[in-house]
Amino acid sequence: MSEDNILTADGWIRGRLVHEHGKILSIEGVPCDPADNDLPYLLPGFIDLHVHGGGGKDIMEGATAFETITRTHVRFGTTSLLATTMTAPSEEISSVLKAVGEFCEQRPSGSARVLGVHLEGPYINPGKLGAQPNFAHTALMAEVEEYLALAPIRVITIAPEIAGHDALIRALSSRGVRMQIGHTLGSYEEGVAALAAGASSFTHLYNAMSPLHHREPGIVGAALAHAKYAELIPDLLHVHPGAMRVALRSIPCLYCVTDSTAAAGMPDGEYKLGSHTVTKCLGGVRLPDGTLAGSTLTMDQALRNLVKIGLPIAEASQRLSQFPADYLGITERGRLQPGAWADCVRLDRSLTLTAVMVEGEDIDFKNA
């Protein structure tokens, strides 16, 4: 590749990245400060752990939608992602999981890599559905086992206050499933207990959870006081920049997601979100009653938004690549170093995306 300011695991290097057979062979160059030159930035590819759709398609539509969704998000620098389900009848969830499980075994040319599934519901509080359809129910281990047999479920969002969910958190976290607290009316104490039981993150922090109050800290308070990881939607609509800064100061490995819907990468109009019809307008996606319903955010815009509120480019990149990879326990993605997958994005000095590579493949994203 041409000479760039390359963000490596050890800092900025002015030089070139050499790759072969999809993996990084070497990074040749010298340490630098990007402020001293006008070269482009070469960053690790973005890893989005919360994707419902894009390009007019929704994950819940099944196999026919996946290639469109992954081709849409790669155009904006997402090189790998988790396909995220909606709360739905169990047979519908099973059908989608089976299709995702099969799709994970391949990566069509020109697409982002699907790393697995984020099961967002149905094990959530019906009083905090947000944009989720009303199919929430208490988790049953037999049902979860059926789901796990169909696809690599990496993350499950769960409301810890529901009876029996503490046992599920213990059982599944011990098997490597990341259990996230979300869509919950739980108390501060219930949030802390869930973390002690093995929960490891929070789903779209601040949104669809009991808020912080100085006498009732709620789930938000549990996250700010105790979490190492949490996901946050940095579209500047879901969370005020001031609240974003509070979370960034409090949660060491806060990482950012899009929570993107079918409307991502598309013009204003009506789109599907699970069984709902949502409307994209004024930069957001909403239900008919005005409730925010996922986002239209893309990861390159997430980077620009983080920089806009004051983060250095290196830290913004870390929260879009390295921290999501670390959270999933993935060492071969999310960082540019020898032996890692050659997943990277190039941006000009205005942070406009100019090139994307997935597993060594140059993506023709402008004509996708």
Language-model regions, residue ranges each:
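Active-site loop-to-helix "anion-binding N-cap" substructures in soluble metabolic enzymes
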Residues: 46, 53-59, 82-92, 208-225
